[in-house]
């Protein structure tokens, strides 16, 4: 008899506890889910961009251009451009553009009139890869072979670890976009013209750059002075 009384007491307390949890959870539902619908919200009027903000001024100038002068870029401009794109900006080796889990899978190649080079951010150098004018391989548009510089972005899938092919393509595309936008912003600050492009002869260019099978060209970006 005593055992039944104990079990009955335990069950009663358990039921009360469960009921309390249910009521407590129900009390939080409006907070988590939101009691109101979107129809109850009012538009938020945003302020106009502040022209005194340096970042705003640069973004106002950011644009794509497909007309380039053949004038070469000075070494100082080329150096700053590459650092802005994908340079090391902290003692721990992190870059001017983020990458997922700091994989740093993107390699930046500079295709110049005399040859193709690989940007080495740690050494602050352009390392020769191949001699010759490969600019025409960096795109199908006529201006590509007239501009003094074509940046070619290459993702090293080996650095992305065990990602699936789909995820590797996603990460490499996102990382490339971040770097390319850095180039756009730097070009806006220097009065340079630039345009990012996907129309690239990837097989021929991969051969010229001596890429491995697990290195994939993502995009190309033409840079130069505006054509006057």
Predicted regions: what they are:
Residues 211-228:
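A glycine-rich helix N-cap at a beta->alpha junction
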Residues 191, 210-211:
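Glycine-centered helix-boundary capping/hinge motifs
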Residues 49, 154-156, 224-226:
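Generic beta-structure capping elements
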Residues 62, 81, 108, 149-205:
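Small-aliphatic-rich amphipathic alpha-helix that forms the alpha element of a beta-alpha
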Residues 1-13:
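N-terminal secretory signal peptides that target proteins for export/translocation
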Residues 36-147:
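N-terminal amphipathic, basic helical "cap/leader" segment at the start of enzyme domains
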Residues 21-35:
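C-terminal segment of classical bacterial N-terminal signal peptides
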